[in-house]
Curated annotation (Swiss-Prot):
It comes from the Bacteria. Cell wall formation. Adds enolpyruvyl to UDP-N-acetylglucosamine. The lineage of its organism: Bacteria, Bacillati, Actinomycetota, Actinomycetes, Mycobacteriales. PANTHER family: UDP-N-ACETYLGLUCOSAMINE 1-CARBOXYVINYLTRANSFERASE. One of its GO terms (biological process) is regulation of cell shape. The gene is murA. The active site is at D117. Belongs to the EPSP synthase family. MurA subfamily. Pathway: Cell wall biogenesis; peptidoglycan biosynthesis. Coiled coil: none annotated. The keyword Transferase applies. This is UDP-N-acetylglucosamine 1-carboxyvinyltransferase. Keywords: Cell cycle, Cell division, Cell shape, Cell wall biogenesis/degradation, Cytoplasm, Peptidoglycan synthesis, Transferase.
Length: 418
């Protein structure tokens, strides 16, 4: 049944919130279990819609998947199927991450082109090019990525852009290829590091983890393992930005602040007091936020997933800010909804200029993707009156217990069935 959120603005948020495992990590870890026959256990899984969706994809490939609490127990068969059908894959983008493991383990794959968030073009060109360099034939046929190989052999691979998805798919095929693979301009995101950590626990030989140059020495086989998902830095930062916007005081636990240094620096520039420990941070804002300029970049830059929240923050900041989107070209669709809330914002190509106002005004708004939805809810927290946010299933795909956590922090928010 379709649902909406009703957000009443004006409340100051305060308290403590613990984040779960990272959405951008857990789905790839689940896919990686296909590389090893037997049962792997993944803990600290977030309570989000995409986890059971990925479980369905894996079941369709012959795996047995048990989900209980924050644990996923996945048993990969001795001969996985290699055809990921459209019905399961179409619902979310990360489903394409089964491509690399299937090519690595089965030497063939047929994966329907995925669905997911409407944030711009995200072609699979680099995924295909990397697999071809490993010796696979890889093409788009009838709406599917079709790949096959007699043997995979290590290669020197230069990525045009440090794509997270391409890095991960190439990596998961290369760990069982013959010889040595070097990925130049590899993605350095904490989620990629988390995947490498699990693969090495399974018996892979991956070096240069977290650096732009990754070296993989192929091994004949991998083995099941148990692994704990890292904390979700995007969810954690969302709570930190919510504190800054509402002039609140929120402690966020369960995440490594080292994964968010630039974001926390920007919050400090906006006037927040930021303190950190090894696995937590606290954001306290006592006055109206100051304007800040933000440019999204691959890690360790400012995450593109937090761009909508940055626009929401600057929409009520003192001064004029420029937000530059360097990763996804269509992510500024979110600005149209912010304008409905009274934001003074305009876009020009990859740039958005936002002139901060003392307060936004309530209006009905629609989510186009996970992060845009979270940004709209944050905007509703500082709007005058009741803001109705529609298509909130997007938010449920990436934020566990979103309404409950906000309510515990002092927000006035309600989930309503349409």
């Amino acid at each position: 049944m379709a649902e909406r959120f009703v957000v009443t603005g004006g409340n100051r948020l305060s308290g403590e919130v613990t984040v779960g495992g990272a959405k951008n990590s857990v789905l790839k870890l689940m896919a990686a279990t296909l590389l090893a026959e037997g049962t792997s256990t993944i803990t600290n899984c977030p309570d989000i819609l995409d986890v059971p969706l990925m479980a369905e994809v894996l079941r369709g490939l012959g795996a047995t998947v048990e989900l209980y609490g924050d644990v996923a127990r996945i048993t990969s068969p001795d001969e996985p199927k290699y055809d990921a059908d459209f019905a399961a894959v179409r619902q979310f983008r990360a489903s394409v991450c089964v491509l690399g493991p299937l090519v690595g383990r089965c030497k063939q794959a047929r994966v329907a082109l995925p669905g997911g968030d409407a944030i711009g073009s995200r072609p699979l060109d680099m995924h295909q090019a990397g697999l071809r360099q490993l010796g696979a034939r890889c093409n788009i046929e009838h709406g599917c990525v079709v790949a096959s190989a007699e043997t995979l052999r290590g290669a020197e691979i230069q990525l045009e852009f440090p794509s997270v998805g391409a890095t991960e798919n190439i990596l998961m095929a290369a760990v069982v290829a013959e010889g040595v693979t070097t990925i130049h301009n590899a993605a350095r995101e904490p989620d990629v590091v988390d995947l490498c950590t699990m693969l090495n626990q399974m018996g892979a030989q991956v070096e240069g983890v977290g650096s732009p140059t990754m070296t993989i020495t192929g091994v004949p086989r991998l083995y099941p393992t148990e692994h704990r998902v890292i904390g979700d830095r995007i969810v954690a930062a969302t709570w930190g930005i919510a504190a800054a916007m509402t002039r609140g005081d929120i402690a966020v636990t369960g995440v490594d602040p080292a994964h968010l240094q630039l974001v926390l620096h920007k919050l400090h520039d906006a006037g927040a007091t930021v303190t950190q420990t090894d696995d937590s941070f606290r954001v306290a804002q006592y006055e109206r936020p100051k304007a800040v300029n933000v440019a999204t970049l691959p890690f360790p830059g400012f995450p593109t997933d937090l761009q909508p929240m940055a626009i929401a923050l600057t929409s009520i900041a003192d001064g004029t800010s420029m937000i530059t989107e360097n990763v996804f070209e269509a992510r500024f669709r979110f600005v149209e909804e912010m304008i409905r809330l009274g934001a003074d914002a305009r876009t020009d190509g990859h740039h958005a200029v936002v002139r901060g106002l003392p307060q936004l005004s309530s209006a009905p708004v629609w989510c186009s993707d996970i992060r845009a939805g979270a940004g709209l809810v944050l905007a509703g927290l500082v709007a005058d009156g009741d803001t109705e946010v529609y298509d909130v299933f997007h938010i449920d795909r990436g934020y566990p217990l979103f309404v409950e956590n906000l309510a515990n922090l002092g927000a006035e928010i309600e989930r309503v069935c349409l």
